[in-house]
Amino acid sequence: MIDKTAFVHPTAIVEEGAVIGANVHIGPFCIVGANVEIGEGSVLKSHVVVNGHTKIGRDNEIYQFASIGEVNQDLKYAGEPTRVEIGDRNRIRESVTIHRGTVQGGGLTKVGNDNLLMINAHVAHDCTLGDRCILANNATLAGHVSLDDYVIIGGMTAVHQFCVIGSHVMVGGCSGVAQDVPPFVIAQGNHATPFGVNIEGLKRRGFSREAITAIRNAYKLLYRSGKTLEEAKPEIAELAAQHPEVQPFVDFFARSTRGLIR
């Protein structure tokens, strides 16, 4: 079903069964599959392919040669009807690829709201992106990677399968991330190592001086005290009881499966 207010260029192909919302713009030479839903106000510039069981929210901008919902690159994939879900107000730039999930990974690749995926970024099967993340040019997320909110991944950086990247993390360009990155941390290198707290990012997002100081103290306990992770955990939990902004560290420790960058 195509809403009467939507525009579909004469050279675009929209397969029967696709749901195209109000004021959607589908530019020249785009291809939209039968099991695709595109929300109100979203724009496909030109030469965009949206395939598979894919749901795209409102007011997204998707640029030339992006490919969304295509068959993933997991050799175990056998054609199951797995999905891609994309939220609202995302900017997906030229040649970005977002692959559908796998049965083994829960069947869903999910992108939240207000994200920017720059040219040639790749989001593999079963990845989860939160809100307001940035993937710079040629950033690559392997399968099952999870990014919390406000994560920045620098250009030409690769993130290993199953890694978890905490909120407000900034990973520098040309890095290789092979383990989990706790929230608020700046990381860089191959393999990525911690380089301090993302203070500028926290200031821009309205964190108070007191909150930033507490986060820095938690970082020092984790990385500068000489303590093992197991020794640092209870002290960070005690700090979180006094400063709620530190709680994401505690929550992150419970989620981490690949170990923390050191």
From Swiss-Prot:
Q: What is this enzyme's EC? A: 2.3.1.129
Q: Name one GO molecular function term.
A: acyl-[acyl-carrier-protein]-UDP-N-acetylglucosamine O-acyltransferase activity
GO terms (BP aspect): lipid A biosynthetic process
Which Pfam families does the UniProt entry name for this protein?
A: Acetyltransf_11, Hexapep
Q: Which pathway does it serve?
A: Glycolipid biosynthesis; lipid IV(A) biosynthesis; lipid IV(A) from (3R)-3-hydroxytetradecanoyl-[acyl-carrier-protein] and UDP-N-acetyl-alpha-D-glucosamine: step 1/6
Q: Does the keyword Phosphoprotein apply?
A: no
Q: Name one GO cellular component term.
A: cytoplasm
Q: Which UniProt keywords apply?
A: Acyltransferase, Cytoplasm, Lipid A biosynthesis, Lipid biosynthesis, Lipid metabolism, Repeat, Transferase
Q: Which cysteines share a disulfide bond? A: none
User: Where does this chain mainly localize?
Assistant: cytoplasm
Q: Where in the cell is it found?
A: Cytoplasm
Its catalytic activity? Answer: a (3R)-hydroxyacyl-[ACP] + UDP-N-acetyl-alpha-D-glucosamine = a UDP-3-O-[(3R)-3-hydroxyacyl]-N-acetyl-alpha-D-glucosamine + holo-[ACP]
Judged by the first EC level, this protein's enzyme class is transferase
Q: Does the keyword Nucleus apply?
A: no
Q: Which HAMAP family match?
A: LpxA
What NCBIfam families is this protein classified in? lipid_A_lpxA (TIGR01852), PRK05289.1 (NF003657)
According to its UniProt entry, the function of this protein is described as: Involved in the biosynthesis of lipid A, a phosphorylated glycolipid that anchors the lipopolysaccharide to the outer membrane of the cell.
Protein family (similarity comment) = Belongs to the transferase hexapeptide repeat family. LpxA subfamily.
Q: What is this protein called?
A: Acyl-[acyl-carrier-protein]--UDP-N-acetylglucosamine O-acyltransferase
Source organism per UniProt: Klebsiella pneumoniae subsp. pneumoniae (strain ATCC 700721 / MGH 78578)
* Lineage, broadest ranks: Bacteria, Pseudomonadati, Pseudomonadota, Gammaproteobacteria, Enterobacterales
